[in-house]
């Protein structure tokens, strides 16, 4: 709710520009409400630049073309498909697999070059507590000051790269009538479901402080926004990539390394790094999704391959549960929750919040971005978030049994209950996930 309020408020207060960079912008309630805020800003004379990855825009061309028709709005798509719909788009995915497999996973909302929201959220109901079934727990950082210039420079690099193509150059169709689209957005924002959601946003105490300009910022001189380059996969030079920069933070001796990653596939190198830290006396902890909470079971299969090795090496693993008291409650009362936060904190002093999953896809295929900080106050807050996620009410502690089996400890009951298989899953889901783990697809996870 607060994340929605921050974006809506920044759009309403913008006077010059809105630069929006996202992997996904869903055709749903939240997507429509924020699109209406963007349109309203453009109507006031604000220049809007919207950069979306093209992998999830199927069926959105009419609406995007309509927005692009506004004189103050320009829409570009990253690494777009030449075929815009139907079976031809699917065939192109097969024919150009190695090319279209590289996606822009960045997420940034920048207003007037003065305020930036950077983190792990896409735009859609499940990212803003408005989904009836599953909502994602996610984390953003709201930035003011010099760090915003970093985010703006990253946006400009992507916007001006050859990978970002104006949507009007891709689709010869006549754009949907802008006035018709605006009328539809206005009608939806006035209906009962939208009003219930907007009422919940307005009732949030922190959202009220935000809109009343009562939030007190935390000032720090040690915050930077970092990103992969737009053409990440072109050439062998990895010096500008985000992954080596993040890995460098794990080098050396540490007291504590705490990781939060919804999609956790450490691979051989990452596993060796974490085990090396644990052997050296570092407390290493990881919070990730359980199989039941993971919306991509194939990714869980990649994690499963390394889980026992990490446990045997002294790494603490916690898996977020899906049901019961762990669930958040969206517009219609969601039945579950899934972790989507991507962050780490080291020695209670420095850390990262962004879009980077600890998996091969983030490391090698997608472009990613996030906020790096060296600040005990911010690190303390992020460490508290880790501890909250790892707490008994939200997650299962994973351990090895006396017989060498993998066990899940439900610490929310007294006495704690020991589970012998993946919690809240069917035999079929466990079996298919195990079968997927045998496939040579780790590089794509």
Describe the function of each predicted region:
Residues 1-107, 111-445:
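Charged, low-complexity intrinsically disordered terminal segments
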């Amino acid at each position: 709710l607060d994340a929605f309020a921050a974006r809506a408020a920044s759009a309403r207060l913008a006077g010059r520009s809105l630069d929006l960079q996202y992997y996904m912008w869903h055709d749903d309630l939240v997507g429509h409400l924020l699109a209406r805020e963007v349109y309203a800003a453009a109507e006031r004379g604000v220049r809007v630049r919207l950069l979306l990855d093209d992998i999830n825009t199927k069926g959105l061309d009419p609406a995007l073309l309509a927005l692009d028709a506004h004189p103050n709005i320009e829409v570009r798509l990253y690494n777009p498909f030449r075929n815009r719909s139907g079976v031809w788009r699917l065939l192109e995915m097969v024919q150009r697999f190695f090319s279209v497999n590289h996606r822009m996973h960045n997420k940034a909302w920048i207003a007037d070059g003065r305020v930036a929201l950077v983190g792990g959220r896409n735009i859609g109901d499940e990212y803003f507590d408005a989904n009836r079934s599953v909502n994602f727990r996610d984390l953003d950082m709201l930035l003011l000051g010099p760090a915003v210039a970093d985010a703006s420079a990253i946006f400009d690099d992507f916007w001006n790269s050859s990978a970002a193509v104006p949507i009007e150059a891709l689709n010869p169709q006549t754009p949907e009538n802008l006035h018709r689209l605006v009328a539809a957005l206005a009608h939806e924002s006035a209906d009962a479901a939208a009003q219930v959601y907007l009422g919940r946003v307005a009732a949030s105490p922190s959202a009220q402080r935000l809109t009343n300009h009562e939030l007190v910022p935390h000032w720090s001189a040690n915050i930077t926004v970092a990103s992969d380059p737009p053409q990440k996969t072109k050439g062998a030079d990895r010096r500008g990539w985000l992954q080596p920069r993040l890995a460098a933070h794990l080098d050396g001796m540490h007291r504590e390394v705490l990781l939060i990653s919804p999609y956790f596939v450490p691979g051989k190198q990452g596993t060796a790094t974490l085990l090396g830290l644990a052997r050296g006396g570092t407390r290493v902890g990881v919070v990730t999704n359980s199989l039941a909470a993971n919306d991509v079971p194939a990714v869980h299969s990649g994690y499963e391959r390394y889980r026992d090795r990490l446990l045997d090496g002294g790494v603490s693993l916690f898996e977020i549960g899906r049901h019961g008291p762990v669930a958040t409650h969206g517009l219609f009362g969601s039945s579950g929750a899934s972790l989507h936060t991507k962050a780490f904190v080291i020695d209670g002093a420095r850390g990262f919040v962004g879009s980077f999953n600890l998996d091969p896809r983030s490391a090698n295929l997608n472009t990613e971005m996030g906020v790096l900080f060296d600040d005990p106050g911010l690190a303390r807050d992020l460490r508290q978030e880790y501890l909250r996620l790892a707490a008994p009410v939200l997650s299962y502690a994973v351990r090895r049994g006396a017989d060498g089996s993998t066990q899940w400890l439900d610490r929310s009951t007294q006495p704690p209950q020991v589970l012998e298989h993946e919690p809240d899953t069917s035999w079929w889901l466990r079996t298919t996930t195990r079968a997927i783990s045998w496939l040579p697809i780790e590089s794509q996870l």
